[in-house]
């Protein structure tokens, strides 16, 4: 079973890693940690009871050096399938992979944006970010619209490879009075 561990850094040295207690559940896996842009929440993936099924994305409040208040993100993010690999853009957009939402096949990358109603709204960025294979582990280079992701696309053996991408800048020109 996977665990999330924490370690303190002093200059160039890391201290001893210790398991982060998210729950007293010792049978479930806890993996793929991502800290929210405001630093108040740790998002993670788990198969612990109370989810929608498979692997779900959960979050727990970070309070000093401890945690408290575990929450399942629920719908529309979690499904009876697997949701994995959460990561954030600085603007708060949550990127994750799922095989439970309609997509191009296998795990697809999705974007969850918080709308004016304070609820998540999902977007599927389509091809070429997603493919018929498993596409996951999307990460960005800081605030730039470029980054990396993993995929087993175009590999008859099913091996994962790392791909780079750059999202095109969308410019809209409005003319009128």
Task: Give the ranges of each region predicted by the language model.
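Short, conserved micro-motifs composed of acidic
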Residues: 1-177
């Amino acid at each position: 079973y996977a665990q999330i561990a924490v370690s303190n850094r002093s200059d160039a040295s890391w201290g001893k890693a210790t398991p982060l207690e998210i729950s007293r559940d010792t049978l479930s896996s806890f993996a793929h940690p991502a800290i929210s842009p405001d630093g108040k929440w740790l998002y993670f993936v788990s198969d612990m009871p109370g989810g929608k099924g498979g692997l779900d994305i959960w979050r727990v409040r970070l309070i000093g050096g401890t945690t408290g208040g575990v929450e399942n993100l629920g719908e529309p993010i979690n499904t009876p399938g697997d949701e994995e690999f959460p990561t954030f853009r600085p603007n708060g957009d949550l990127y994750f992979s799922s095989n439970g939402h309609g997509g191009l096949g296998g795990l697809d990358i999705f974007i969850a944006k918080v709308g004016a109603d304070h609820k998540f709204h999902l977007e599927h960025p389509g091809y070429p970010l997603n493919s018929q294979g498993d596409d996951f582990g999307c990460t960005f280079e800081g605030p730039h619209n470029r980054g990396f992701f993993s995929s087993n696309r175009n590999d008859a053996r099913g091996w994962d490879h790392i791909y780079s991408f750059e999202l095109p800048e969308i410019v809209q020109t409005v003319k009128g009075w």
